[in-house]
Every structure is written in structure tokens, then in C-alpha cells.
């Protein structure tokens, strides 16, 4: 059942001649490191390609260690965005991107046993952790914890003024 579910959420892209295969959220034709790393927890048991997404995020990592949230080759905002391009996005409020990159690398290594692969990736992983632990937007020096801004996006906000019960509910069963 898990295998069938995840198989429907695989996206294959070719960027600069490199084949990239990864898990995606069903609502977007893009590969988010967040979704991919979470889905790898189940997919690592049967997915044949666990490294190409990690390699691509490593390849596109900024010199300071920042990692993109997602990439896509499909237009997202029609009709203004056109095809035949590759888009990389970092959502500034997200504070979990770098650790999810490290988590994805760990899960890929755990499943494949690619010791040389993970060894070669270590400088990128260290750089990602250094970035998140030293950036004033994401690191609370006093508490020694990652912090994130409170925003109305990414599931933080559900204000209905009591008018829409369906907008804010909890499943108890």
C-alpha cells in the first residue's frame, strides 16, 4: 500500500543532462526537499534512486550553505510563466530546509550503503548545518535552537472568525 502510494508521487526530471528522480507532493509538479525527505522514510525500502535529488540540491547549494526549498521545470503560474525553464525557490521563512537536506542524505546513505558518496557529500552537509546555525533569521543564539517566523503561510494560521467550521478542524478518530 505504501509502495503504491509513493509510486504515484514520483517525479522524473532532466536538468542539464542529469536525470533526477524524487518524491513530490501530489499537489505540485516540483521536488521539495521537505516532502522528498519525509517520503524517503518509506520509499528507502524500494525506490531505486535515492541519491539524484540529494545530489541536485547539493549541486545548487549556495556558497554560504543555503539550500533551495524546491525546484521544478514546470510552469506554476500560468499564463505568465512559460515552459522550457528551470526554477529554484527558497522561501525565506522556512527554517527546516538545511536539516531536511542532511536528513535526505542520511536516509539515502542508510539505504544504499554508499560510504564514498556520503563522504564526498560531507562538506556540503556541514556547510548547510553551519548556515542554519549561524544565520540570524534561523538561529536563536541564546537558546541554541532553530527558530522560524510566525506567518500566515505554511499551516500557521487558521482564522475564521467562527464562520467556517470546516476550515479549522481536528480528526479525533
Q: Model regions: which residues?
A:
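The feature captures the catalytic groove of carbohydrate-active enzymes
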Residues: 25, 70-100, 133-173
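Generic hydrophobic/packing signal
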Residues: 61, 71, 75, 105-113, ...
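Alpha-solenoid repeat scaffolds
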Residues: 50, 63-64, 73, 77, ...
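The substrate-binding groove and active-site-proximal loops of carbohydrate-active enzymes
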Residues: 33, 85-91, 109-119
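Low-complexity, Ser/Thr/Pro/Gly-enriched N-terminal "stalk/linker" regions
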Residues: 1-31, 51-52, 56, 66
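Extended, well-ordered alpha-helical scaffold segments
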Residues: 1-5, 48-60, 114-135
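Alpha-solenoid helical-repeat scaffolds
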Residues: 30-33, 95
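Well-ordered alpha-helical scaffold segments within catalytic/enzyme domains
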Residues: 36-49, 100-117, 173
